[in-house]
Amino acid sequence: MEHDADVGLSRFAADPVSLHRLVREAEIAAALRRAEAVDARGALDGTWRLLIAVAAAAPEELDALHAGTLAPVLEHDGHLGTELVGTLATYLRSDCNMNTTAAAGHLHRHTVAYRLDRLHELSGLDPRRPEDRERLGLALKAHRVAVAARER
């Protein structure tokens, strides 16, 4: 008999006052795993761990990051059925290679360029610039964490 389970881990804290926050971190990590936004090890590392901790302790900070980056793009995608955020995620996963992004999305590379230009217009952040790309990548992860944090 086979059983599947998603387990979320939190950081360690010796202070029992932190228990509620740590349980919340574990819940968010498990929700991310269920959504396949992160693999089991990924939720324990780097940026994911930081964003999970922020979501558990100060979710309004993730909301502020979201509002200042991806909110207008997600709204545009929702109204028009476009895939700007999906294209951005694929572009970042593809090491910012237009040809690889186009192939992964079954698109022409000019379509990818157009979508990235449109994302730039909507967000004010250019995914071709390293500083903006870093902020957009963080915002994508923060959005996934915020969605997982709302799941109960």
Predicted regions and their residues:
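Cytosolic nucleotide-utilizing catalytic cores of signal-transduction proteins
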Residues: 1-152
